[in-house]
């Protein structure tokens, strides 16, 4: 039986956005259970829409009285499908949206006490993540996620880049905003300068593969916001990203793969295999960044 222990707040800084704070509270949930629900949430969404694995788990904690040891995959999938609604956008295209948690538990037939429990469990699960690095007392990382995620929604509206991808790449490319390139130029995506760039530049060391080091010229920005805006513009103006299917992809796994396919990074392991998409996907899963996408796909 999986037991929830006392929820421990990971930060007390009142200036940090509540949503970001709630992403990183510590609850003792077995890693295997988290992976199980993450994978099922992605499977149900079928790379078209993002479900919340935490909402699925909270519902099952009510249905099975917190004993998740005998859960059947089919049972979870049946509930998960209730979150998905087929709609038509303004252009007449068929799309999938996600129903609100309260609507689904009502459809399931939970009584008032069960609804209360489901919401309590969901609140406790808000801070659970797959990562062993729970960000406890690491306020600089929390603030970095907050800063980038706030701007990522605007980037999504303009260029259809999922918030999870924007935040995940920013973390990966800038080492949580701590890289020399990031500190010296506000370039948090590692975008190099080319003939199309007329702005400021800076030279910095970089590593393309697992064991090499080179010096390259990168774009320099006056702010993080400018870096994020140019990141979206850079992807949009380079036809190879359109050809790779980046802008049509609606799931973090397919957008990550499209970035790799288009050559955003050519990083390889010692066996010569491209590994950028896998690294980015794992980072997003580890910190539950895919739940940022859940918000933009919810039915209003």
What are the functions of these language-model segments?
Residues 1-167, 171-172, 176-300:
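Catalytic cores of secreted/periplasmic lytic hydrolases that degrade extracellular macromolecules
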């Amino acid at each position: 039986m999986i037991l929830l222990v006392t929820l421990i707040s990971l930060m007390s800084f009142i200036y940090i956005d509540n949503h970001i704070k709630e992403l990183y509270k510590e609850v003792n949930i077995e890693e295997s259970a988290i992976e199980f629900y993450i994978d099922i949430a992605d499977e149900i969404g079928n790379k078209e829409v993002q479900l919340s694995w935490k909402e699925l788990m909270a519902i099952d904690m009510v249905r099975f009285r917190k004993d998740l040891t005998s859960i059947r995959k089919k049972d979870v999938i049946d509930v998960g499908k209730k979150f998905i609604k087929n709609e038509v956008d303004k252009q007449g295209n068929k799309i999938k949206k996600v129903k609100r948690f309260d609507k689904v538990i009502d459809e399931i037939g939970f009584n008032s006490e069960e609804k209360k429990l489901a919401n309590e469990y969901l609140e406790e699960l808000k801070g659970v993540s797959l990562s062993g690095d729970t960000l406890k007392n690491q306020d600089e990382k929390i603030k970095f996620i907050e800063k980038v995620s706030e701007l990522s929604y605007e980037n999504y509206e303009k260029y259809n880049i999922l918030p999870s991808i924007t935040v995940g790449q920013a973390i990966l490319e800038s080492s949580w905003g701590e890289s020399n390139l990031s500190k010296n130029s506000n370039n948090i995506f590692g975008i190099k300068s080319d003939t199309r760039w007329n702005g400021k530049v800076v030279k910095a060391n970089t590593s393309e593969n697992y064991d090499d080091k080179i010096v390259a010229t990168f774009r320099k920005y006056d702010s993080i916001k400018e870096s994020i805006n140019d990141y979206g513009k850079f992807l949009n103006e380079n036809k190879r990203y359109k050809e790779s299917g980046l802008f049509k992809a609606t799931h973090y796994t397919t957008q990550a793969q499209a970035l790799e396919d288009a050559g955003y990074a050519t990083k390889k392991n010692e066996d010569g295999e491209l590994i950028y998409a896998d690294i980015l996907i794992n980072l997003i899963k580890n910190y539950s960044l895919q739940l940022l996408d859940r918000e933009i796909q919810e039915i209003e």
